[in-house]
Regions:
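Extreme N-terminal basic, low-complexity initiation segments
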Residues: 1-10
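Terminal targeting signals and extreme-terminal segments of soluble enzymes
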Residues: 12-13, 17-21, 27-171
């Protein structure tokens, strides 16, 4: 019996049979797919101040984020303020652009948002972001926000991939 460690076989078992890791067919880039949400608003800033944002990767081109609505997010009419919805989309979709760009910092170039329905106190707001196209310097994406399994807003945007280091997601 041969007791030698078989590196190739071990890599195959770990990378190809592990459901949390995907390998792109032409590029040997590993992308970790999270089954659970993670808090992305860890640094002091706007999103952390406003309750944070949970995020997870679904696939190489699809990401999900969520938050629960509190009194701080409401406007005078008792529904979620449009500015807060915009900030949530910007942070969630921006994190998707960051992840799709192999961790490079990204900044919003344009963001178009359409408000469809009101969101109320205590509801969970869930966003699904899909990368439509990625170039060396830009990420084009769309986003759909849902609450109680109903679409409440849609968005599309463009993010610039910066050539900086040290920046993180979730502002």
């Amino acid at each position: 019996m041969d007791n030698k460690f078989n590196f190739t076989k071990s890599c195959y078992i770990f990378f190809y049979l592990n459901p949390y890791i995907r390998i792109s067919s032409n590029i040997y880039t590993l992308i970790l797919m999270n089954k659970e949400f993670e808090q992305i608003s860890l640094k002091p800033g706007f999103m952390k101040h406003n309750g944070g944002l949970l995020f997870k990767s679904i696939s190489e081109n699809e990401y999900q984020f969520k938050t629960t609505i509190t009194e701080n997010h409401l406007n005078a009419a008792g529904i979620v303020h449009g500015g807060y919805i915009s900030a949530v989309v910007d942070a969630g979709a921006g994190t998707a652009a960051h992840r799709a760009s192999n961790g490079s910092p990204c900044v919003t170039i344009s963001l178009e948002l359409k408000f469809i329905s009101a969101i109320k106190l205590g509801q969970e707001l869930v966003g699904i972001t899909k990368i439509q196209k990625k170039t060396k310097s830009m990420v084009f994406l769309t986003c759909e926000l849902k609450s109680s399994n109903k679409i409440v807003a849609t968005a599309s945007g463009v993010w610039k991939i910066l050539k900086l280091s040290g920046a993180g997601p979730g502002g």
